[in-house]
A protein has these predicted regions:
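Motif-centric detector for short Cys/His coordination patterns
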Residues: 1-77
Length: 77
């Protein structure tokens, strides 16, 4: 992943290094104890691009694997 931008309503525009890009909706993925705090839209919007993980992450340690996001992007677009 080389770029990520928050669009609102848990939607994130992603770009991967192979040229694939598009929008993923993560609203249905925020379940479980670790991800529950991200249901707060303000908190969700504070993700950053972690170049070590090649994915988006949050300061409290939550993240999605790049493979998961790539597959979700392929399925949505």
């Amino acid at each position: 992943m080389i770029d990520a931008r928050y669009l609102g309503d848990y939607k994130v525009w992603l770009e991967f290094n192979d040229g694939r890009k598009g929008v993923v909706d993560l609203s249905d993925e925020l379940h479980g104890e670790e991800l529950e705090p991200l249901r707060n839209r303000d908190r969700f919007s504070e993700f950053y691009l972690d170049y070590g993980l090649a994915s988006i992450a949050w300061l409290d340690g939550q993240d999605f694997t790049p493979e998961f996001l790539y597959d979700k992007l392929k399925a949505m677009n």
